[in-house]
Amino acid sequence: MQKNMDTCPQLTIEVTDDGSATLFVPALDEHYHSVKGALTESQHIFIDMGLNHCTVAHPHILEIGLGTGLNCFLTYLSSKEQNRNIHYTGIERYPLNEETIHQLDYATLIGKGHAKAYYAIHEAEWEKDVHLSDTFTLHKIEGDFTQYNFQGKYDLVYFDAFAPEKQPEMWEQSLFEVLYKVMNPGGILTTYCAKGIVRRMLQTA
C-alpha cells in the first residue's frame, strides 16, 4: 500500500525522439528523461555504462529516483538475458499513478513479452523484497532520499535525480558521502549528469 506522504507534482506525457515516452514536470520545467530519447538514454547511461561495467556476479543495485520504472525494467530484462541474479532497490518520493504508468506504454515498446513484469514493478509492495523472477528481486522504498537511512550495501548506484539546477537539494556533497558509505569497495555510481561540480563531489566523497 502506498503511503502517499507527498502529493505527486502535475505531470504531462511527451514522446521523445526515439519514440519512447517521458514525463514533463511543469513546476520544474524539467523532463524525466532526455527529449532525444528516453529509452536510448536509460540504456546507454544505466545499462551500457553502469550494469555492463559491474563485474560483481550477483550485484545489489540502488536506484535514486525509481520514477517511471524504465531503468528498473531494462535491468530486469538484462538479468533475464544474462541469467544474472540481481537485487534491485529503488527509492521514490512521488510514485506514479496507474493511469500514467499505462500511458507510458514501455511494456509494449520494449517488453518483448515481458509486459507483466513491467507492471509488476509498479504493483509490487513497498518496503519488502518481491521476487519478479528467478533472477530478479525488487525492493521498493517510498521515501525522500535526502532523509532516508539506507541499511544495505550496494555494488552499483543509478543516480537518476533531476538536474542540479532544477533540484539542487539532491546534489549536496553530504548526500554523495552517504552514497559512498553504502557502496561496496569498487562500487560504481552512474548518472547522466557530467558537470564538473558533480565529478568533483564524487571524487571528494
Segments and roles (model prediction):
Residues 196-205:
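Conserved Class I S-adenosyl-L-methionine
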Residues 69-73:
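Glycine-rich SAM-binding Motif I of class I
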Residues 58, 153-154:
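Local beta-strand N-terminus motif with an aromatic residue
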Residues 100-151:
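S-adenosyl-L-methionine
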Residues 155-170:
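A short SAM/SAH-binding and catalytic strip from SAM-dependent methyltransferases
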Residues 170-185:
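A short glycine-rich, Lys/Arg-flanked "PGG" loop and its adjoining helix->strand segment in the class I
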Residues 1-59, 76-110:
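Rossmann-like AdoMet
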Residues 185-193:
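Conserved beta-strand signature within the Rossmann-like core of class I S-adenosyl-L-methionine
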